Amino acid sequence: MDKVKIALQYMLPKHLLSRLVGKLAAAEAGTLTTAAIKWFIKQYKIDMSEAAQSEPQAYKSFNDFFTRALKPGIRPINQHTNIMVHPVDGAVSQLGPIKEGRIFQAKGHHYSSLTLLGDQVQDAKRFEGGDFATIYLAPKDYHRIHMPIKGTLSKMTYVPGELFSVNPLTARHVPGLFARNERVVAIFETEHGPLAMVLVGATIVASIETVWAGTITPPTGKQVFTWEYPTVGPDAITLDKGDEMGRFKLGSTVVMLFAKDAIDTFAEGVEAEAVTRMGQAFANLNNPK
């Protein structure tokens, strides 16, 4: 059965399907929208008591519901200076060292950090010998993405690609999954070196948004797009630890890359398959150089 599910993903018109679902999710269809939201809440056992708007009818579209805000203070941010926090609610897929430019995906599968970053050679060099973490956001999860530490945006790259599902089953069977799918790479300068936040698209993920540029995907065409940003002066974009940096419409995966020696140890309990809650301790950082 697993092989059949994977084979179907290769056969499906994933981009067409994603565009169609995106239009439906953006539709403001009144009682139909509310009914769809109620079904989704029941199907995935979503705790709406955490949402800023807990009533399904408060959302005009399914996208509004899916990117819902949480109540203030429901995810307190660990403010310890040398603590990096979880950027999302989800589950750790994998984490560990970046060795010779290779990142572990699942048993028997690695992929290239260079490919993940859109073949940006200088960017990949900055993370050689560092660490990575991959976090999967299930349909039930809160889908806004926050900063794990304070950082100033220096570069953003849009990389076109496939739209395979990014669930654990697909990660085990599709080689180079996260470096094959459509993605947005945001690089920040921090006190602990560069930080890459890679927002990976997936089947029926209608779009990826950032707080500084709005909707990024999908643009017209199949080429890589790169934007560079000033890191000093009035136009610099600096986000504090815990600030929202982006969101998924219909969920996906975040891959984080850290510079060599930035991380001392991952926090207690942070390991593959561990549940994550945005704002809780993710890693202990070394002192800034």
UniProtKB/Swiss-Prot annotation:
Keywords: Cell membrane, Decarboxylase, Lipid biosynthesis, Lipid metabolism, Lyase, Membrane, Phospholipid biosynthesis, Phospholipid metabolism, Pyruvate, Zymogen. GO terms for cellular component: plasma membrane. Its EC number is 4.1.1.65. It is found in: Cell membrane. InterPro entries: PS_Dcarbxylase (IPR003817), PSD-B (IPR033177), PSD_type1_pro (IPR033178). Binds 1 pyruvoyl group covalently per subunit. Is synthesized initially as an inactive proenzyme. Formation of the active enzyme involves a self-maturation process in which the active site pyruvoyl group is generated from an internal serine residue via an autocatalytic post-translational modification. Two non-identical subunits are generated from the proenzyme in this reaction, and the pyruvate is formed at the N-terminus of the alpha chain, which is derived from the carboxyl end of the proenzyme. The active site is at D89 (charge relay system), H146 (charge relay system), S252 (charge relay system), S252 (schiff-base intermediate with substrate). It comes from the Bacteria. One of its GO terms (biological process) is phosphatidylethanolamine biosynthetic process. The keyword Lipid biosynthesis applies. Its cofactor is pyruvate. It is a peripheral membrane protein. GO terms for molecular function: phosphatidylserine decarboxylase activity. Heterodimer of a large membrane-associated beta subunit and a small pyruvoyl-containing alpha subunit. Belongs to the phosphatidylserine decarboxylase family. PSD-B subfamily. Prokaryotic type I sub-subfamily. PANTHER family: PHOSPHATIDYLSERINE DECARBOXYLASE (PTHR10067), PHOSPHATIDYLSERINE DECARBOXYLASE PROENZYME, MITOCHONDRIAL (PTHR10067:SF6). This is Phosphatidylserine decarboxylase proenzyme. The lineage of its organism: Bacteria, Pseudomonadati, Pseudomonadota, Gammaproteobacteria, Alteromonadales.
